[in-house]
Amino acid sequence: MKINIISVGTLSKEFQVIFDDYIKKINFYSNVNLIKIKEFKSNNKDLIIKNETMAILEKIPKNSKVFLCSLNAEQYSSEKFALFLQEDNISFVIGGSHGVDEKMFKGAWKINFSKMTFPHQLFHLMLIEQIYRGFSILNNKIYHK
């Protein structure tokens, strides 16, 4: 099993340390790969969205089940989210600060973590923690209560 997290931008050293700690825990269950997309700089928001979306799409492996993190999506419980992790090849997409062109992600599942807004770096930790929690649920580990 392989999980890709394709994200626009980078993590600070402090957030990267925590992120890497979760990856070590998850590697017992699955291989996790963080694919970083460079932020596109422009004063034109539409151009930023277009270029970042295209860069993300180029990095999605063939035959990967794509989960687009979106404000325009359904929210799931941790137990339901865990069921998504039973796919063989998964790619989670985290767009940049302006989002992505969601029409370009045909066939992708859309997931929403909250109606609240979170800092980009914090969301990485929320996603990786839910992936770890999901594997804990699937494997009947005490972590999820």
Swiss-Prot record:
InterPro entries: Alpha/beta_knot_MTases, RlmH-like, tRNA_m1G_MTases_N
Keyword Cytoplasm: yes
GO-annotated molecular function: rRNA (pseudouridine-N3-)-methyltransferase activity
Sites where the protein binds S-adenosyl-L-methionine: 68, 95, 113-118
SUPFAM superfamilies: alpha/beta knot (SSF75217)
Keywords carried by this UniProt record: Cytoplasm, Methyltransferase, rRNA processing, S-adenosyl-L-methionine, Transferase
Alphabetical list of Pfam families matching this protein: SPOUT_MTase (PF02590)
Chemical reaction(s) catalysed: pseudouridine(1915) in 23S rRNA + S-adenosyl-L-methionine = N(3)-methylpseudouridine(1915) in 23S rRNA + S-adenosyl-L-homocysteine + H(+)
Protein name per the record: Ribosomal RNA large subunit methyltransferase H
